[in-house]
């Protein structure tokens, strides 16, 4: 299942269980600036013992160096058919991204590497789905696997900086 609320996840789990079907994976959107699953879905995932594959760990590209200065002409935010609406690229969100980039640099990572490392460092996350447009992006993103741990002080700074940027474009749970 993908992007269901905690309540709906529990309902689906019960329906599947009544039919002897195991629910293996929940696939929510999750990133440093899209943390809606932390409200209650992570508790449900743990309780039901299902995997969590986070998609959009780079928040549709916002957690890359692409948006550090402005909206590039060739980007998801400039594409009118994209899920990433320009209205989500607010001054507040850009400030958060800029501050996170400074933390990443101190860690010796790019912003995208730190964002992926952070998602994967959460013990309720089984894996992360990354989307790349080039071999270079793939190589850079895979480097995040070389530095998955965070110190307590890094986590404190990141959590203080990375507030939910309200960019969850899948906010509305799927209906069935």
Regions found by a protein language model. Give the residues of each.
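Glycine-rich beta-alpha junction loops
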Residues: 5, 30-34, 56-63, 118, ...
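Acyl activation and transfer enzymes in specialized metabolism, enriched
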Residues: 103-117
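Aromatic-lined glycan-binding groove of carbohydrate-active enzymes
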Residues: 37-76, 110
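Structural preference for beta-strand elements that scaffold enzyme active sites
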Residues: 22-27, 49-53, 126-129
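Terminal-tail/helix-coil boundary detector
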Residues: 47, 75-106, 121-125, 133-135, ...
């Amino acid at each position: 299942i993908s992007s269901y609320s905690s309540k709906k996840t529990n309902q689906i789990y019960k329906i599947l269980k009544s039919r002897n079907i195991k629910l293996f994976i929940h696939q929510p959107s999750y990133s440093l600036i899209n943390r809606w699953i932390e409200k209650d879905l992570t508790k449900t995932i743990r309780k039901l013992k299902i995997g969590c594959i986070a998609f959009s760990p780079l928040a549709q590209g916002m957690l890359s160096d692409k948006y550090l200065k402005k909206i590039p002409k060739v980007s998801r935010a400039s594409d009118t058919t994209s899920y990433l609406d320009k209205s989500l690229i607010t001054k507040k969100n850009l400030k958060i991204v800029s501050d996170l980039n400074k933390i990443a640099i101190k860690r010796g990572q790019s912003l995208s590497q730190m964002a992926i490392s952070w998602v994967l460092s959460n013990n309720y996350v089984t894996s992360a789905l990354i989307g790349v447009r080039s071999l270079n992006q793939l190589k850079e993103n895979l480097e995040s696997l070389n530095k998955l741990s965070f110190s307590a002080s890094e986590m404190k700074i990141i959590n203080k900086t990375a507030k939910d940027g309200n960019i969850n474009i899948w906010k509305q749970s799927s209906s069935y």
